[in-house]
Amino acid sequence: QGKVLGEFSVKQGVKTVAIVDDRTAYGQGLADEFKKAAEASGLKVVATEYTNDKATDFKAILTKIKSTKAELVFFGGMDAQGGPMAKQMKELGIKAKFLGGDGVCTPEFMKLGGEASEGNFCSLPGMPLEKLAKGPEFREKFTKKFGAEIQLYAPYVYDAVMVMADSMKRADSVEPAKFLPAIGQTRYDGVTALIEFDSVGDLKGGAISIYQYKSGKLEYVETLGGSAVDLAKADVKEAVAEVKEAAQAVAGAATAVGKEVAAEAKDVAKSAAEAGKDAVKAGAEAVKNAAEATKAAVEKK
């Protein structure tokens, strides 16, 4: 997430960023990766501050950040700190944009941040269900079977279980010592993506989706990361399906028109043949009459 969020910051048109993390493994790791990506993308990190996962008063570090005139504040941490931090930024008159990871992409963040959460950005792993190539089909099957609306992580949990089942099948064992190594060789076409893992066990090409708080709810902004390719594939697949459907419709119409034209041509040919017969008959009659008239004239002389 940190890498993708660093790249997203550049797209926001900012040039300076301040970074705060809560010193937890999650928060610090996220902030460190964000910093690397931000600097690699040409952004200037004007402040790096730290707090902890129990704090609720951030005015001291935010006052320092305000003096740097940072255009964006990135927070590596959870909603319990992120919400109050966003609220205190507003109270201090800090105009910088606020950005965080999935730890602040929660209803609790909105509750704690109140009006100050409006316009802030956060991220969640994966893509929205409607953006997944197999998402609509999964939703339909899920609601039909369970009679309930699908939950956010349902397709990812489903794929996780199916990856384990696939690994057990390939290892021919349900013993963890035997099937866990097989997970590393996974190549599974799941609901969420084509699932493969790198040498350290991370998901290859994992997509990250960006959301923004608007009017008390999260709104999807865009998807970044390797699996954004899957998003493009889904769009292409949909376009191909539409083209195929249109082509079939055209072919069907052409066939119908062809049959109609053929039928009309057959009728015309039949009419022409009958007219030809009548013409030949009339011609023969005329020749016969002419012959008789000639004979009568000769006999008269």
Feature map (PLM): residue ranges:
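Composition-driven recognition of long, low-complexity, acid-poor segments enriched in small hydrophobic
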Residues: 228-298
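Extracytosolic ligand-binding ectodomains
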Residues: 1-248, 300-301
